[in-house]
Structure formats: C-alpha cells, structure tokens
C-alpha cells in the first residue's frame, strides 16, 4: 500500500513534470505569458470549434425549417461570435509551429463556414453549410489530438473526450434536422446511430475517470440526465413540436457538456499551478 509520503512524492513529481511541459508550451517570458491563454484553455478553445461548427449548421437548418425562429437566429448569432472570439484569443497564444499551422488552417475553414451564413437558409445553402461544418469538425478534431499529444497529461485527454461528446451530440441534432429537411444523404442514419453509441460510451468513460471534483461529478450527472432527455426527444417524429423539443434539449445538452469541459480545463490549470 502506498504511504502518504509516497503519494505526496508521486504528486510532487507529477506536478513538476507537468509544469515543465507547461513552461515549454507557454514560454518563459512573464510579460508574454500574462498576455496569453493558458495552454489548457487554448486547447479547449481550438477544440471547441467541433461543437460550434455543428451548432452553426444545426441552427441554420432550424431557420430553414422555421423552428423557433427568434431562438434559432439568436443562437446562430451567438455561436458566430463565439467562433470569432475564440480565434482572437488563440491569436494571443504562443504555440509550437505545428499547432500554430493547424490552428491557422482551422481558422480558414471556420471563416469559410461563416461566409456561407450570409446567404438565406435555402436547402442548397444549408447543405453547403453542413458540409463545411463537417470539414471544420474534422480539422478541429485533429488539432485537438495534436494538443493532447503535446500536453501528455490525463486531464488533456479528458478535455478532449468531454469536448468531443458535446460536439457529437450536436451533430446528432443536426442530422435530425437534415432528415426533416429531406437533406439526408447516404450513410446519415448509420452515422447517427454510431454517434449515439459514441456519446453513451464517452459519458461512461468520463464517469469512470480518476480525475474528478465535486463540481465535475455534479455536472457529469446533469449531463447524463440531459442526455436521456435528448435521446427521448430524438425518438419524436420531425413535426413542429418534435423539432422544437430537439432544438431546446440539444442546446441544453450543449450548455451542460460545455460547462463540464470547462471544468476539466480548470482542473488541468490547477494541476499546472
């Protein structure tokens, strides 16, 4: 059995190793560091484009279908602003060349998606936005994985995992609305089933993870409960009431999982000191 002294030594050793990585990533100049995001938060900001891309396409499709027009328009405007703010914050972060290049490429894809949103939500426009959103999500996923490899700490993996669940849940909702708009292409139903299974497994993995706090456990329970509401909503026919229910439950799920991901970000910052 590990003694208290051994545990303290182990924690201290781990903290020193993580801080060494943090120092390498964040830079040694105090003035620069103060102007930059913590690397864990930069990781979260870049990875957040997974969920933001799907929410953009989802709410744009909701506008096409006439689902809660005022709510959908406000959500779309808010998400577009979050994308811009996120990249503005990332521009303040010093990072290795490979990561900087990935973030720059990701921004180009996100800008292209945003440019499409100036057009009215026709079927053709919604289809184009959905396709571009998938490109943004793929690029954001690879960027998140690159951040995780550099960080080499368990909390980074959890930020990535929690962040992916929030994104995949929104892709499920987007697919529901694409089907309602009769824009469901080949393989969409299979993707929805796979995504549903991925979120269930992801939430189970997070629940079993050793990195936890009371706040994380509470938010995770809220997330799992909200997921059940969302699953039930997804069983409804895509009529007026059904689409409204999916729109509201998916946004509530996004809110909870976004907060959960931010809590993992906070836990990593505490470890980094």
Segments predicted by a language model, with ranges:
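N-terminal secretory signal peptides
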Residues: 1-12, 20-30
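Intrinsically disordered, low-complexity sequence elements enriched in Ser/Thr/Gly/Pro
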Residues: 5, 12-13, 48, 164
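Sec/Tat signal peptide C-region and signal peptidase I cleavage site
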Residues: 31-35
């Amino acid at each position: 059995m590990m003694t208290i002294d051994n545990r303290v030594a182990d924690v201290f050793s781990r903290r020193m190793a993580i801080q060494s990585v943090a120092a390498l990533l964040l830079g040694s100049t105090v003035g620069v560091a103060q102007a930059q995001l913590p690397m864990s938060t930069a990781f979260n900001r870049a990875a957040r484009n997974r969920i933001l891309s799907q929410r953009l396409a989802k709410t744009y499709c909701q506008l096409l279908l006439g689902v809660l027009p005022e709510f959908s328009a406000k959500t779309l405007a808010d998400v577009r602003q979050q994308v811009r703010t996120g990249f503005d914050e990332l521009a303040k972060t010093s990072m290795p060349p490979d990561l900087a290049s990935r973030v720059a490429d990701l921004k180009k894809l996100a800008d292209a998606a945003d440019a499409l949103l100036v057009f009215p939500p026709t079927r053709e426009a919604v289809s184009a936005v959905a396709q571009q959103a998938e490109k943004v999500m793929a690029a954001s996923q690879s960027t998140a994985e690159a951040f995780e490899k550099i960080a080499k700490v368990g909390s980074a993996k959890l930020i990535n995992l929690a962040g992916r669940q929030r994104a995949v849940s929104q892709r499920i909702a987007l697919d529901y609305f694409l089907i309602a708009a009769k824009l469901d292409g080949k393989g969409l139903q299979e993707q929805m089933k796979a995504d549903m299974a991925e979120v269930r497994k992801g939430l189970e993995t997070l629940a079993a993870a050793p990195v936890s706090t009371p706040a994380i456990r509470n938010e995770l329970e809220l997330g799992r409960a909200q997921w059940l509401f969302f699953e039930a909503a997804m069983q409804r026919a895509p009529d007026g009431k059904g689409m409204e229910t999916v729109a509201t439950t998916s946004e509530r799920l996004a809110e909870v999982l976004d907060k959960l991901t931010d809590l993992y970000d906070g836990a990593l910052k505490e470890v980094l000191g």
